């Protein structure tokens, strides 16, 4: 099996999206999970102007655009079993569109409680449950849940199944369901905490499996490791943490790695690291990688072990500004990237490299303002179920 380092290093740009009418930052990317012989794959991109653009996966031709709704959108995700695409909104809803449909209006609307302003969400692996994280209001920072199963072809509005309110004390910036267990979900917050829940429990206090502390505001979380029994997180001040949940019921520490500022300790060959973008767990190789970059558009691949982060290789010549999002396709070994230069790029290994002129960095203000708050307390704690 070819090493992912070699796969990544051999990537070249094969497609670039067409120039949009309104240049925006590309803040999030996801691809359709369903395979249809008569239909090509889709790419959904979250833009800083509050819209979601749907592209053909191979040609990167813009097919349609969803937008115009009140509130800012956060996150973008395809369903696992169909071509529905979701996003959370600060107007207190999670919206669902038909990515192949003609209508620009949502086909489902998941309403939160009156005070909710959602800034994160995810859909579980069976497409049965949606969970969204809200900004703190008064003393409450809510995780809200809905039944996501379709019951009608017409526009339907769903009220929440319930909410968790006792486990975070500030804005909930990240929510991620387990890739194969529909009952497990992890959340991250500006309070620095990363919480793991088992939704099969009846009460919130019983559902809380573990609480880990990143000691800073959480910007990204994900599952990794064999059977996805590990979690990692990144912070708004470029910290990185990695925990092993296999050790919850042992005397072994669950912290595999805790780096307060990756920029200070990572040696990048012939360059430097300005920020972290996200994590990449390669299931077949059972290896965790961290993706970072520079303000001029270079992308770095870092290998993650308990000894630290090691620079593996870099991609350059594609973006001209900060890269905000990526999506790695394991089956095709291809990469989609989006950035502040408004460019969506498709990279593939071994392809004939095409010559492109990098676009100038956009001089526009991002609609997403991240607040960084540093906290200090125990590196982690665990709650045992009674």
Swiss-Prot record:
Gene3D superfamilies in alphabetical order: YVTN repeat-like/Quinoprotein amine dehydrogenase
UniProt xrefs under PANTHER family: WD REPEAT-CONTAINING PROTEIN 89 (PTHR22889:SF0)
Superkingdom of this protein's organism: Eukaryota
Coiled-coil regions, chain positions: none
Protein keywords: Repeat, WD repeat
Swiss-Prot/TrEMBL GO biological process terms: corpus callosum development; ventricular system development
Species of provenance: Mus musculus
Repeat listed as a keyword: yes
Keyword field contains Repeat: yes
PROSITE patterns on file: WD_REPEATS_2, WD_REPEATS_REGION
WD repeat residue numbers: 21-65, 68-107, 112-156, 167-207, 213-253, 318-357
Protein name: WD repeat-containing protein 89
